[in-house]
């Protein structure tokens, strides 16, 4: 009976980790949360690459890890948007619209160019430096999240990190 209760509780909690972001999330965060369909497709692709189905425990671990990684991704994106917006004086909605894809690396120069285009003027050297630093931090955070997630999933499923990394775009990472 205890085991059954544990499994049911685990399934309920795993479902929470893969549910789309609800109230209280910013627009950028909610659009970058892995949907249950994305997570299911990712799990199916993992199973296909591995050549066998994941166990229930592996499936739950993968779902939890992907949910946690997406939260980290959203935090990195929101930090980037907040730092850049505060530096150049643009509100969150404008900055968020310029950089909607949290899971994709940004070119530092392209970020500066987009902001300058939106403002209609050149950024000061200090603002350019701050935007480039925020962009580099965001890109490094994204890379670390991707690498860490791939290594964690790989170690739990017996797959190489490179194989898991190749599947990350299915999650928006």
Named regions from a protein language model:
Residues 17-19:
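Bacterial signal peptide processing site
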Residues 2-9:
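Sec-dependent signal peptide recognition
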Residues 13-15:
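C-terminal motif of bacterial Sec signal peptides marking the signal peptidase cleavage site
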Residues 48, 52, 56-162, 166, ...:
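Surface-exposed, polar/charged faces of alpha-helical domains
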Residues 23-53:
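Post-signal peptide N-terminal segment of mature Sec-exported envelope proteins
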Residues 7, 25, 32-34, 93, ...:
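Intrinsic disorder/low-complexity detector
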């Amino acid at each position: 009976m205890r085991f059954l209760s544990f499994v049911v509780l685990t399934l309920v909690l795993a479902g929470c980790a893969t549910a789309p972001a609800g109230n209280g999330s910013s627009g950028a965060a909610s659009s970058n949360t892995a949907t249950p369909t994305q997570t299911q497709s990712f799990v199916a692709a993992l199973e296909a690459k591995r050549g066998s189905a994941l166990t229930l425990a592996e499936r739950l671990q993968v779902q939890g890890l992907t949910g946690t990684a997406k939260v980290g991704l959203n935090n990195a994106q929101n930090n980037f948007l907040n730092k850049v917006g505060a530096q150049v004086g643009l509100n969150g909605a404008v900055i968020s619209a310029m950089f909607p894809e949290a899971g994709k690396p940004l070119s530092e120069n392209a970020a500066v160019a987009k902001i300058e285009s939106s403002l209609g003027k050149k950024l000061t050297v200090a603002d350019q430096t701050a935007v480039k630093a925020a962009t580099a931090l965001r890109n490094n955070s994204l890379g670390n999240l991707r690498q860490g997630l791939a290594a964690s999933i790989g170690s739990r499923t017996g797959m190489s990190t490179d194989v898991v990394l190749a599947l990350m775009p299915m999650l928006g990472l």
